[in-house]
Amino acid sequence: MVAAGAGVTRLLVLLLMVAAAPSRARGSGCRVGASARGTGADGREAEGCGTVALLLEHSFELGDGANFQKRGLLLWNQQDGTLSATQRQLSEEERGRLRDVAAVNGLYRVRVPRRPGTLDGSEAGGHVSSFVPACSLVESHLSDQLTLHVDVAGNVVGLSVVVYPGGCRGSEVEDEDLELFNTSVQLRPPSTAPGPETAAFIERLEMEQAQKAKNPQEQKSFFAKYWMYIIPVVLFLMMSGAPDAGGQGGGGGGGSSR
């Protein structure tokens, strides 16, 4: 008995320790109650508890293939639902390549992992991507807007990129205008449909039932309510019609005797 009691005590202690252990937000890279952290180069660590990083990559190649390289990080604060971006400057070689791709009407592609706080591989769960004509990005002086669409589980389900003002008009662009991205970012959480007003419906139903219980007369039929008026009228009609029927019968008999 003593050994069994000691075993139960140890089991309870272990359960309490597991329950009290700090949990890690799944896929967010943020511990509950953790202090602020710096963002690593690989995007695994976030700036603070509740903030996760997504590796933002881009690709602009002369061929049909894609060769994604790091463009920066998208920082998603899951506590207040805000999104921000940190991006690196384009090198001279990248600026020249972007011009070459724009000259042949090539594409500029961007992508982020589906699971925030993860790198390439099986943990990332794949990527979501978008693209615009490279010439429109060049003529916008690298001014674009990134919109991140997420689901209720915190996974990325969509990414869109729009450049301003857009279009390819063949305008001349200075090299210094292609050094830094001028990016605005926004987060699109899932839209929840309005649920049924179950509580209001139940409350209204209970009020109707209570009202019916207070006024049982309302449950009676039309005849049950007005029988004292209906019966005299029926009797009057029956009695007033009886002499007419007798008179018509007598007149018919006299005619046949002649």
UniProtKB/Swiss-Prot annotation:
Cytoplasmic side: 243-258
Mutant lacking the gene: phenotype: Knockout mice show no cardiovascular phenotype at baseline. After myocardial infarction however, capillarization of the infarct border zone is impaired and the animals develop larger infarct scars and more pronounced left ventricular remodeling and systolic dysfunction compared with wild-type mice.
GO annotation terms (biological process): angiogenesis; positive regulation of angiogenesis; positive regulation of endothelial cell migration; positive regulation of endothelial cell proliferation; protein insertion into ER membrane by stop-transfer membrane-anchor sequence; tail-anchored membrane protein insertion into ER membrane
Side Lumenal, residues: 26-221
Keyword Translocase found: no
Signal peptide start and end residues: 1-25
UniProt keywords, alphabetically: Angiogenesis, Endoplasmic reticulum, Membrane, Secreted, Signal, Transmembrane, Transmembrane helix
Alphabetized Pfam families for the sequence: ECM10
Transmembrane segments: 222-242
Keyword Nuclease: no
Any one GO cellular component localisation term in the record: endoplasmic reticulum membrane
Tissue specificity: Up-regulated in the left ventricle 3 days after myocardial infarction (MI). Expressed predominantly by monocytes and macrophages from bone marrow, spleen, and peripheral blood 3 days after MI (protein level).
PANTHER family: CHROMATIN COMPLEXES SUBUNIT BAP18-RELATED, ER MEMBRANE PROTEIN COMPLEX SUBUNIT 10
Family: Belongs to the EMC10 family.
Known partners and oligomeric status: Component of the ER membrane protein complex (EMC).
Protein task: Part of the endoplasmic reticulum membrane protein complex (EMC) that enables the energy-independent insertion into endoplasmic reticulum membranes of newly synthesized membrane proteins. Preferentially accommodates proteins with transmembrane domains that are weakly hydrophobic or contain destabilizing features such as charged and aromatic residues. Involved in the cotranslational insertion of multi-pass membrane proteins in which stop-transfer membrane-anchor sequences become ER membrane spanning helices.
Protein name: ER membrane protein complex subunit 10
